[in-house]
């Protein structure tokens, strides 16, 4: 056998050894297609349409039966930040309990069955006021029912900022609303809202608000709100006045 014949015979055996495997190719193609289809489906299911998600999240948040919260309001006056209020509270079916500081005064207030119970900071005793009209005033609206600050007439300039990973994964958005809250609308303008929306339940659990004073634009308002324990059964009871 000549050298060329030996080479030809060896090449033939090599070709048979590495025969093209169509089954493997088909499997690879199918896996690629399924992977791509899964990715497309995932993106479709998790797609975010800000103009639809934001009003839905606001509606779901403002319609809860109960919640707990932390809220802080700061005023910016001549470049300096001044604390207006910092309270924590809980609210259920129109009844509430809040504790903290408002306008430099320590407060501990419970509102149950149209009665306001206010704890005296000096004696520690509870005083009762029949009729809760004082807490219908605009001054206390944010501290008493902070989700009311989410109510709006229009939502403008909605900007989706993406997903923020954390203890609670959240959709993050910014927008400029036309607010209906009387306290906010009376004294402030040029509102800028930033919200964190629970990815799972589509409710707002964190809110940040900036606004300019109507008469003195260089002065501003900064509000921070944390919401949690949505629709939990809360135990808000009247304290002993003895």
Regions found by a protein language model. Name each.
Residues 64-66, 93, 104, 111, ...:
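Extracytoplasmic
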Residues 73-75, 100-103, 120-122, 208-213:
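Beta-turn initiation residues at beta-strand->coil junctions
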Residues 168-242:
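Gly/Pro-enriched, hydrophobic low-complexity segments
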Residues 47, 119-185:
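Flexible, processing/modification-adjacent segments and terminal tails
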Residues 56-59, 86-93, 109, 113-116, ...:
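Extended lipid/amphipathic-ligand handling interfaces
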Residues 81-86, 103-108, 112-113, 187-193, ...:
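Short, surface-exposed coil-to-beta transition loops
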Residues 88-143:
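An acidic-aromatic
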Residues 2-95, 232-242:
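N-terminal leader/targeting segments and the immediate start of mature chains
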